[in-house]
């Protein structure tokens, strides 16, 4: 069913996001079941979940790639993206949030906000994505809905408000009171939660529910001060407020990111999922509510604003690449304006390349249906795009617009990889090329000294899973080295160099002469190369060769061969020879010159620092902190609740290999930890000397 048959206001593009074990994929599975997409409920722990379609996901019981699927509910079309909760796959979360209009954050009723929930929440803040929350696993020992709501306020700074009051808890959890309709919902276990009975609120809960409802109405009145009629009703006659009036104000508050309503339930036991579906439709924004999309007009370099209209100019963002053994390369896109038709020729404005769409597919996890067109608000997949990668803009040939790009973090961990046999060499190159196209945080490079192929990623699990995929999908057998830290080099003071490259060996010689000035760039800004050549001392046609040589020279540092970052290079002077100068000579000279300048600019080695969060029983707290200190960690703070303590620290990645195993033995298996890349910092001198020796 295309969006042509759907009013734009009835479309919801949503993500489901959470910490690794909060039950996110199970929640999505139940949504698919109740909305009629699957006839049998998939269980994650049995390896049968529809959304976890990669073999590695079904084995590990975690979600790695964001599967996209479409369901219909209450007359609305909901495009759902299930995102991974493991920190090694933050890129999947990042790129999903970039193209979503709203999200459901799933929390565990026992743990509340966990470290990874904070990361995902911050990513959603960055893109201004409206969110509602679902406190899952209400049937677990120690489940506490109200404590989970409080932890959202404290740790996330969310304006979290309960819209349910649970009836019973742990194994006695039977349903919830809906504070808006003021009805108690009791789920019938024999119908798999598909049916429930509405009853009056029991006497023992009446007072608590009245208080919660009054708090909710007061909050709604304050977040929409322009709605005076609603405010007066709340103050003077709250009982006269209709459900529709509450839903209207709630919807406005959610879309404006002023409130995060919190529901409760247990997806695994089928309680509360339809209630969640109802409010996804009622409260989360449509593409219209999210407003115009901003971009840059390439012809005028002016910022432009595009309305979400079917008949508008085409503007779409490629947000994921997938390689399929039968169909080939599939590009997932989100359309912000206009309509995309099968067979049409379009422009990739990011790369200035023409593309042709051979097929359009609507995805349901890894099943697919052919479509003739996608239109504004759609999330779909295209076959036939050769040049487009994640973050590229697709538009009409005559309307050159570029949308805001997706930013990707640098990898922090390296491994050497080599084919087991000569026959595997070509297959390995093909596999690495496909995987790095799919995942922008996976990089492939060659160590110039040893000639080894190096793969880099966001963590050990990330590279492990990619290695698994090589064996399964590309049938490549490869040997992989031990994980190594992905160090970088930079300079700390300004420097300069004058370099001549002269070769005479009979016949035509080689001649190039380049003078450079270098200085540290702002941290995180990357390398910049500018030409300040005047008067043609180096002819125009050789400048690109000098720049290419400098860029290649920066790829291998002067201390230990790690790539140089945050260096600003200016080409200031030089000379040439009428006969002997060539592009090759200037390229070699550029590379030699930048190396020479860097040696004079007090180079240092930088190491990735990880943000580490450890949750441990309080009686092991001293051991955990002592161990982090021994690993050169900087303790940022700690907080305790219900006998458990959370320690937040910044620790160099080089000290964290095998940490999970040692934490397990330190705390008898009772502590858990997460870590994610935070920033790069200068390595202590003694450690720098050891790295250089190696």
UniProtKB/Swiss-Prot annotation:
InterPro entries: EFG_II, EFG_III, EFG_III/V, EFG_IV, EFG_V, EFG_V-like, EFTu-like_2, G_TR_CS
Protein known as: Elongation factor G
Domain of life: Bacteria
Protein location: Cytoplasm
Function: Catalyzes the GTP-dependent ribosomal translocation step during translation elongation. During this step, the ribosome changes from the pre-translocational (PRE) to the post-translocational (POST) state as the newly formed A-site-bound peptidyl-tRNA and P-site-bound deacylated tRNA move to the P and E sites, respectively. Catalyzes the coordinated movement of the two tRNA molecules, the mRNA and conformational changes in the ribosome.
Family according to the record: Belongs to the TRAFAC class translation factor GTPase superfamily. Classic translation factor GTPase family. EF-G/EF-2 subfamily.
Sites where the protein binds GTP: 18-25, 82-86, 136-139
GO terms classed as biological process: ribosome disassembly
Organism: Chlamydia pneumoniae (Chlamydophila pneumoniae)
């Amino acid at each position: 069913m295309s969006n042509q048959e759907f009013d734009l206001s009835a479309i919801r593009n949503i993500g489901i996001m959470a910490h690794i074990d909060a039950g996110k994929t199970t929640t999505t599975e139940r949504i698919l079941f109740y909305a009629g997409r699957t006839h049998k409920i998939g269980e994650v722990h049995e390896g049968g979940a529809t959304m976890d379609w990669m073999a590695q996901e079904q084995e590990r019981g975690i979600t790695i790639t964001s599967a996209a699927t479409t369901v219909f509910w209450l007359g609305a079309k909901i495009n759902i993206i299930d995102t991974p909760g493991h920190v090694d796959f933050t890129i999947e979360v990042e790129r999903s949030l970039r193209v979503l209009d709203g999200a459901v954050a799933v929390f565990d009723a026992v743990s509340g906000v966990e470290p990874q929930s904070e990361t995902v929440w911050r990513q959603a803040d960055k893109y201004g994505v409206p969110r509602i929350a679902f406190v899952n696993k209400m049937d677990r020992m120690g489940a506490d809905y109200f404590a989970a709501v409080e932890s959202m306020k404290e740790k996330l700074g969310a304006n979290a408000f309960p819209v349910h009051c649970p009836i019973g808890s742990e194994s006695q959890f039977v349903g919830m009171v809906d504070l808006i309709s003021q009805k108690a919902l009791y789920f019938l276990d024999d119908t798999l939660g598909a049916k429930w009975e509405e009853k009056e609120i029991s006497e023992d809960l009446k007072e608590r529910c009245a208080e919660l409802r009054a708090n909710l109405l007061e909050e709604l009145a304050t977040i929409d001060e322009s709605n005076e009629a609603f405010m007066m009703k709340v103050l003077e006659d709250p009982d006269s407020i209709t459900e529709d009036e509450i839903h209207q104000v709630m919807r406005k508050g959610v879309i404006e990111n002023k409130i995060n309503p919190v529901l409760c339930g247990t997806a695994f036991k089928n309680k509360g999922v339809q209630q969640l579906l109802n409010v996804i439709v009622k409260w989360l924004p449509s593409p219209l509510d999210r407003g115009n999309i901003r971009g840059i007009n390439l012809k005028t370099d002016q910022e432009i604003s595009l309305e979400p209209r079917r008949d508008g100019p085409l503007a779409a963002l490629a947000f994921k690449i997938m390689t399929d053994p039968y169909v080939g390369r599939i590009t997932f896109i989100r359309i912000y304006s206009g309509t995309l038709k099968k067979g049409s020729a379009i422009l990739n404005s990011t790369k200035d390349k023409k593309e042709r769409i051979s097929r359009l597919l609507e995805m349901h996890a890894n099943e697919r249906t052919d479509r003739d067109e996608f239109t504004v608000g759609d999330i779909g997949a295209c076959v036939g795009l050769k040049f487009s990668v994640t973050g590229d803009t697709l538009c009409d040939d005559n309307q050159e617009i570029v949308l805001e790009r997706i930013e990707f973090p640098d990898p922090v961990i390296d491994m050497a990889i080599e084919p087991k046999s000569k026959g595997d060499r070509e297959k390995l190159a093909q596999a690495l090329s496909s995987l790095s196209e799919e995942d922008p945080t996976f990089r492939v490079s060659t160590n110039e000294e040893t000639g080894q192929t190096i793969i880099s990623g966001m963590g050990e699990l990330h590279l492990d899973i990619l290695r698994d995929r090589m064996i399964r999908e590309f049938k490549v057998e490869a040997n992989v080295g031990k994980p190594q830290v992905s160090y970088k080099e930079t300079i700390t003071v300004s420097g300069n160099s004058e370099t001549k490259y002269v070769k005479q060996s009979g016949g035509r010689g080689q001649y190039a002469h380049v003078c450079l000035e270098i200085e540290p760039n702002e941290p995180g800004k990357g390398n910049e190369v500018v030409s300040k050549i005047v008067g043609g001392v180096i002819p125009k046609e050789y400048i690109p060769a000098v720049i290419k040589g400098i860029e290649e020279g920066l790829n291998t540092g002067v201390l230990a061969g790690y790539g140089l970052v945050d260096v600003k290079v200016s080409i200031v002077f030089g000379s040439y020879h009428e006969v002997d100068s060539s592009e090759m000579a200037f390229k070699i000279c550029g590379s030699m010159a930048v190396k020479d300048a860097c040696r004079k600019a007090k180079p240092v080695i930088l190491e990735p620092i990880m943000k580490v969060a450890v949750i441990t029983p309080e009686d092991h707290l001293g051991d955990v902190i002592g161990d982090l200190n021994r690993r050169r960690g900087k303790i940022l703070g700690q907080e305790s609740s219900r006998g458990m303590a959370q320690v937040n620290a910044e620790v160099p990645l080089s000290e964290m290999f095998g940490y999970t195993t040692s934490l397990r033995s330190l705390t008898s298996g009772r502590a858990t930890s997460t870590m994610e890349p935070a920033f790069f910092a200068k390595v202590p001198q003694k450690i720098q000397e050891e790295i250089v020796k190696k």
